[in-house]
């Protein structure tokens, strides 16, 4: 339960990471004010999902920046957690945050590719596009919210196991809301096929991680 001591080496990457995240938020707010205003109220109403989920069948810069922000936020959360528990051997000390960021981006991009591949196998392209849009919206919102809490914790010297548990809870709860939104949006269609719908969700959400873990094991065993 001891708080982290804010050594210079610890803050070397934390400050630029916060600066980048808040800079991306400012960019979205300045260049997409209507978009951003609707996104801010994501947990209050589903206006953002209802309007932009249909409009943005193709990649939109707002969604791309959100996704990038999510990657940086998650990397920062992992970085702080690893520093707190003294985990240093997996990455070089000097470039630990950069390596984590690249790893998170690679994993999430691979996950997207695998989800698209799984959706094409089951002929679920339309559903998968809606699914991915909602998941990105909520998971990015969760990551940004967790980083805002982390910002207060880091610069108040309050980073502890309790705070890390709170951050994990924020990620878990808001991501769970995305599943509620997906089910609500497809309730009429899934009622007669609830079992198959659960299988589809498992295929889209769990299958990518199975492939990633299997691939990682192959790489490790061949080294």
Report each predicted region and the residues it spans.
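Membrane-interface helix termini and inter-helical loops of multi-pass transporters
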Residues: 2-4, 81-93, 158-160, 222
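Alpha-helical transmembrane segments and their membrane-interface exit regions
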Residues: 24-25, 44-49, 171-179
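Hydrophobic alpha-helical membrane-embedded segments
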Residues: 6-38, 110
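Hydrophobic alpha-helical transmembrane segments and adjacent short intramembrane/lumenal linkers
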Residues: 128-210
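Juxtamembrane boundary at the C-terminal end of a transmembrane helix
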Residues: 209-223
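Selected alpha-helical membrane-embedding segments in polytopic membrane proteins
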Residues: 32-123
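Hydrophobic, aromatic-rich alpha-helical transmembrane segments
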Residues: 7, 11, 15, 19, ...
């Amino acid at each position: 339960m001891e708080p982290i001591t804010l050594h210079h080496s610890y803050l070397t990457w934390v400050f630029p990471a916060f600066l980048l995240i808040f800079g991306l938020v400012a960019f979205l707010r300045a260049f997409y004010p209507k978009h951003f205003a609707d996104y801010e109220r994501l947990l209050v109403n589903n206006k953002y999902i209802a309007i932009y989920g249909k409009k943005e069948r193709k990649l939109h810069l707002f969604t791309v920046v959100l996704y990038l922000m999510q990657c940086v936020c998650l990397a920062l959360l992992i970085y702080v957690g690893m520093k707190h528990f003294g985990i240093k051997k997996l990455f070089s000390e000097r470039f630990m945050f950069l390596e984590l960021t690249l790893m998170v981006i690679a994993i999430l991009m691979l996950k997207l590719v695998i989800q698209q591949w799984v959706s094409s196998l089951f002929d679920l392209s339309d559903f998968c596009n809606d699914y991915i849009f909602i998941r990105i919206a909520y998971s990015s919102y969760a990551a940004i919210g967790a980083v805002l809490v982390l910002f207060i914790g880091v610069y108040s010297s309050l980073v502890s196991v309790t705070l890390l548990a709170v951050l994990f809870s924020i990620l878990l709860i808001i991501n769970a809301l995305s599943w509620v939104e997906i089910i609500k949006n497809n309730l009429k269609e899934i009622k007669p096929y609830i079992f198959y719908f659960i299988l589809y969700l498992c295929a889209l959400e769990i299958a990518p991680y199975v492939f990633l873990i299997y691939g990682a094991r192959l790489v490790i065993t061949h080294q």
